Swiss-Prot record:
TM spans (from-to): 15-35
InterPro entries assigned to the protein according to its UniProt record, in alphabetical order: KdpC
GO terms for biological process, alphabetical: potassium ion transmembrane transport
A GO term, aspect molecular function: ATP binding
Assigned protein family: Belongs to the KdpC family.
Membrane topology: Single-pass membrane protein
Protein name: Potassium-transporting ATPase KdpC subunit
Annotated Pfam families: KdpC
Gene: kdpC
Length: 190
């Protein structure tokens, strides 16, 4: 009986060392050597080298000279009241909930007031509430507003949108999307 206890204790210790120490260390080293950008959060820096965000997490843009992101039920976990570990999630409001309808109507009105034709992803938040992309159609809907605010030639703005449009994953999965943060940084750096 003692022998079985010692064997099980050794097995537990060995598995713990393998799964809690050795395996994570190997994954960490491989990640840092093979995929350092992704392993460190896909961080994006500005022209001064300051980190301004992640390519994987959206941000709120409200100024006229910027492309606007999707609405976020959690406000992209920004601000003083944001959880330090970050949060994600949708509003979980039912389609019949009047609060959801009010939010969508207010967003549609804001877009129309700014001469932007509402598209689905400019009206509805994503499931995670952190989506960094808008559709190419949503970028085109904001084209005139941004071009006017920045006094940028249309062909130059169209070129920037095209450059920052990411295709389907492996050519077949998902939909093309425009990363709003990288597009807005490109506008600032032009």
């Amino acid at each position: 009986m003692i022998r079985n206890f010692v064997i099980s204790l050794r097995s537990t210790a060995l598995l713990w060392i393998l799964t809690a120490l050795i395996y994570p260390a190997i994954v960490l080293v491989i990640g840092q050597l093979v995929f350092p950008y992704q392993a460190n959060g896909s961080l994006i820096t500005d022209s001064q080298g300051q980190v301004v965000g992640s390519a994987l997490i959206g941000q709120t843009f409200t100024e006229e000279g910027y492309f606007w992101s999707r609405p976020s039920a959690i406000n992209y976990s920004e601000g003083a009241d944001a959880s330090p570990t970050g949060i994600s999630g949708a509003s979980n409001l039912a389609p019949s909930n009047p609060d959801l309808l009010s939010r969508i109507e207010a967003e549609a009105q804001r877009l129309e007031d700014n001469a932007v034709q509402p598209t689905a992803d400019l009206l509805y938040s994503s499931g995670s509430g952190l989506d960094p992309h808008i559709s190419p159609a949503a970028a085109q809907a904001q084209f005139d507003r941004v071009a006017k605010a920045r006094s940028i030639p249309p062909q130059e703005l169209q070129s920037l949108i095209t450059k920052h449009t990411e295709g389907r994953f492996l050519g077949i999965f998902g939909e093309p999307g425009v990363n709003v943060l990288t597009l807005n940084l490109a506008l600032d750096n032009r």
